[in-house]
Design a protein with these regions (language model features):
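Long, hydrophobic/aromatic-enriched structural stretches that serve as scaffold segments
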Residues: 119-124, 131
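Acidic, low-complexity central loop/insert segments
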Residues: 127-172
């Protein structure tokens, strides 16, 4: 008997831990701190940026979800991963990584950006927030941009870190 794994969809389900210590997956694939809000909707989770994010809510059909966003407002907890880039050379690094100049982004403002390899292949996209003159957060879609920051930061005075924040979206 041959089983074709492409015929299956693998998801993570939220189950009660009954006060026991967290299992390994809880430490290596964290869920959004507000994911308890999704539990009444019987969510199925998938990995996005090494974080668990809801892929489906089993108490609502795809059509119901579509119309909820079109005619109402939803509060969605996402797997977008913010990375903090700070230091005197932060702007220089980001101008190496992104295709659009970040020099024009003023503190307190955002800019849509996308990162490409040197040959033009796209790595990922997201929103860049300039928090201060030398401090940025980039909320990225799924992709390995952290390694690309590190590869391009040689001889630059920058710090690249996870600011330990999670993103929620208001849609509709």
């Amino acid at each position: 008997m041959t089983i074709n794994l492409s015929d299956f969809r693998f998801v993570a389900k939220a189950i009660s831990n009954k006060g026991h210590r967290p299992r390994e997956l809880a430490r290596t694939m964290p869920a959004h701190p507000l994911s308890y809000m999704e539990l009444p909707f019987d969510p199925e989770y998938t990995l996005y940026n090494s974080r668990l994010t809801p892929e489906a809510l089993n108490t609502a059909s795809d059509d119901e979800m579509y119309w909820a966003v079109r005619s109402n407002v939803i509060f969605r907890h996402t797997g977008e991963l913010p990375i903090e880039i700070s230091g005197p050379d932060a702007e220089t690094l980001l101008n190496r990584v992104f295709t659009r100049s970040v020099s024009k982004v003023k503190p307190g403002r955002c800019s849509y950006q996308f990162a490409c390899y040197h040959d033009g292949g796209m790595i990922t996209d997201g929103l860049l927030l300039r928090i201060e003159k030398n401090k940025y957060w980039f909320a990225q879609a799924d992709g390995d941009l952290f390694s690309w920051y590190k590869a391009n930061s040689k001889n630059l005075d920058v710090q690249i870190s996870d600011p330990d924040v999670w993103i929620s979206q208001i849609q509709g």
